[in-house]
Amino acid sequence: MKFSPLLDELIQSLRCLPGVGPKSAQRMAFQLLERDRKAGLKLASALSSAMSDVGHCQSCRTYTEETLCPICTSHKRGTSSTICVVETPADVLAIEAGGHFTGRYFVLLGHLSPLDGVGPEELGLALLERHLASGDVAELILATNPTVEGEATAHFIADMARRHKVMISRIAHGVPVGGELEYVDSTTLALSFNGRLPL
């Protein structure tokens, strides 16, 4: 069945979301049109505002509507000498949800991937190097993902940071709390044994 052009455009637009295929997009569109037009209009307004007004913090590169994000402008955290390097703004939210890190962040917005044309320039490493050269950074925590690309990115940044006499650490990888060993993959188990701590 052929839909109206506007409905078809809505369905096709919803498909840009991760994990949303044609059927899911169609269900979402029908839900908004049949049962919740008010929420649909609110979604459209929020989406339009976010797309036009949300940019990147000039210091850490996370999402913000201002020049600097709330963490970078915080009196307690904006002057912290510890920077945690992450791949995405979603990683910042995940770490913040834990409530244990009290320093600043630097968001790469990806990882090194020469085959995809992603090099140091695309990750904003010149800005990170300026932070390191300022003398205000005592420790750099590398919290890139434990993937081949994430590890390569962490090693590249560590080499860069060593030139500035900054302490470098890498977040631990291993068995998750509440996890059962029989379900943990061999690579994660090896990392857990290699990174074990004395009691």
From Swiss-Prot:
Keyword terms, alphabetized: DNA damage, DNA recombination, DNA repair, Metal-binding, Zinc, Zinc-finger
SUPFAM superfamilies recorded: Recombination protein RecR
Zinc-finger ranges (C4-type): 57-72
Q: Domain named Toprim: which ranges?
A: 81-176
Q: Organism source for this protein?
A: Shewanella baltica (strain OS155 / ATCC BAA-1091)
Name of the molecule in the record = Recombination protein RecR
Molecular function as annotated in GO: DNA binding; zinc ion binding
Task: State the family named in the UniProt similarity comment for this chain.
Answer: Belongs to the RecR family.
The cross-references to Pfam families, in alphabetical order and at most eight, read:
RecR_C, RecR_HhH, RecR_ZnF, Toprim_4
Any idea what job this protein has? May play a role in DNA repair. It seems to be involved in an RecBC-independent recombinational process of DNA repair. It may act with RecF and RecO.
